[in-house]
């Protein structure tokens, strides 16, 4: 009896993990939320009006005028593409849509978070 219960519990756990696993591609909802930008996976995201000290210093070192930033800033970002090659297609941190990623992912500007729970 205990073996059957253990087997059933294991099967249920595995089935739940498979159902909860993220898909291989960003959804169409994500693309609709990212008009004119690129979907990025960033280790952190900060709103323009609440940049921390270290982020402000980093932007200064890159000759970016902090006062001119009006949209969010992503830090340590990689691209997410639809095919699943290159930068990868899954994100365990913050998904954002950025319009300016000219700093090789160190800093991405013009970012807004992607709400995937629609």
Curated annotation (Swiss-Prot):
Its main location: secreted. GO terms for molecular function: structural constituent of cell wall. Residues 1-20 form the signal peptide. Keywords: Cell wall, Disulfide bond, Glycoprotein, Secreted, Signal. CDD domains: hydrophobin_I. Aerial growth, conidiation, and dispersal of filamentous fungi in the environment rely upon a capability of their secreting small amphipathic proteins called hydrophobins (HPBs) with low sequence identity. Class I can self-assemble into an outermost layer of rodlet bundles on aerial cell surfaces, conferring cellular hydrophobicity that supports fungal growth, development and dispersal; whereas Class II form highly ordered films at water-air interfaces through intermolecular interactions but contribute nothing to the rodlet structure. This is Class I hydrophobin 1.
